[in-house]
Amino acid sequence: MRIALATCLDMPRPDADLPILVEAFAARGARAEVVPWEDPRAEWGAFDAVLVRSTWNYVGRYRDFHAWIDRVAAATRLVNPRAALLWNLHKRYLAELAAAGIAVVPTGVVLHGTEPDWEALFARHGDLVVKPAVSAGSFATIRVRRGDVAAARAHREAHLERDLLVQPLLASVVSHGETNLVHFGGRFSHAVHKGARWDGDAEQSRGLVTPAADELALAQSVLAHVGSAGFGPLAYARVDMARGADGRPLLMELEIVEPSLFLDRAPGAADRLVEVVLGAV
């Protein structure tokens, strides 16, 4: 069996998950090959499945990446499924999850070419987090201190062609960081603690943690909604959360396109993912 691990040509940083996955697939008798998604020579239909991994440069080639998803899904099995990937590319999904009753960090979407009322946003939320609605990693994600309208407008101007997200900066993110819960086949695998990350920062995993019961419950409610929406079973998902002012966990992002899975931190995790992928092919 041949499995493609989709990555990208101009990697912003090494993907530590890739060699671990190649070895884990080999242990199950499958051949995993690392293939850049934008490689015009790639014959996707020759693979039994394409597992989306570190396609991190799609942010600057959104339409091309959308077309690639369509093309691969028509040629072979795409993991995660096409519908789930397309839904997750634009972070408007956070508003949908909030409307469904999921505890989500308050999120406003600023459509491309428009300017929000920054003064009102600062008055409502204090310090802000501003980032593109289509992004990977910490691309163009900044903290804007309360009242710094000039900085907010400058960032808006620099990314005028993009939809942006505006969220309050959670105090817990600054003081403690966030918790990322990794799931394979809808089941919890492992969790890591990460520090705050801004534009240009590297991933800052601080090691494995045991999530609290309310964090596990939030992650399950998020994944249950995705399942009920008909997006098909998810081979992998990373549910990122932090605690709000009242101490409750709040969803920050649901990563089902190209999340780092921190397989090097969790012995056996790669085997669990491989089992799910091979079981679906």
Per-region residue spans from a language model:
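Active-site nucleotide/adenylate-binding loops and adjacent lid/helix of ATP-dependent enzymes
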Residues: 3-7, 69-75, 79-176, 210, ...
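A short beta-turn/loop motif at secondary-structure boundaries
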Residues: 41-43, 135, 170-174, 242-245
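A short beta-strand motif that forms the metal-chelation/ATP-contact edge
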Residues: 47-52, 180-183, 248-260
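Anionic group-transfer/hydrolysis microenvironments
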Residues: 55, 133, 169-170, 182, ...
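Glycine-rich phosphate/pyrophosphate-binding beta-alpha loops
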Residues: 56, 138, 197-198, 255-265
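Phosphate-binding site of ATP-dependent enzymes
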Residues: 142-229, 242, 250
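ATP-dependent carboxylate activation and anion-phosphoryl transfer catalytic cores
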Residues: 213-281
